[in-house]
From Swiss-Prot:
Pfam families with a match to the protein in the record: Ribosomal_S17
Organism for this UniProt entry: Rhizobium etli (strain CIAT 652)
Entries under SUPFAM superfamilies matching the protein: Nucleic acid-binding proteins
Top-level taxonomy: Bacteria, Pseudomonadati, Pseudomonadota, Alphaproteobacteria, Hyphomicrobiales
Keywords annotated in UniProt: Ribonucleoprotein, Ribosomal protein, RNA-binding, rRNA-binding
Family: Belongs to the universal ribosomal protein uS17 family.
Alphabetical list of PANTHER family matching this protein: 40S RIBOSOMAL PROTEIN S11 FAMILY MEMBER (PTHR10744), SMALL RIBOSOMAL SUBUNIT PROTEIN US17M (PTHR10744:SF1)
Keyword Coiled coil: no
GO BP term (any one): translation
S-adenosyl-L-methionine as UniProt keyword: no
Quaternary structure note: Part of the 30S ribosomal subunit.
Protein name: Small ribosomal subunit protein uS17
NCBIfam families: PRK05610.1, uS17_bact
Highest taxon above the source species: Bacteria
Length: 79
């Protein structure tokens, strides 16, 4: 099974070697047919502590690193 890759914005960088990434998804509401935004936060591994709040990054699914961390940052798209 291929690894999932998501894109989001870094919203937390206080932890050592970890960033919190907010991933937003959009979908049409089944009844209202209106575009709805929902977001979810993922903890991702940042080996060199190089990503800061506001950076847009891609995260990739990986083996569990800790209790909450199952993603790793693979690239930055910019600010």
């Amino acid at each position: 099974m291929p690894k999932r890759i998501l894109q989001g914005v870094v919203v937390g960088d206080k932890n050592e070697k970890t960033v919190v990434v907010r991933v937003e998804r959009r979908f049409a509401h089944p009844l209202l047919q209106k575009t709805v935004r929902r977001s979810k936060k993922y903890k991702a591994h940042d080996e060199n502590n190089q990503y800061k709040i506001g950076d847009t990054v891609s995260i990739e699914e990986c083996a569990p690193i800790s209790k909450d961390k199952r993603w790793t940052v693979i690239a930055a798209q910019g600010k």
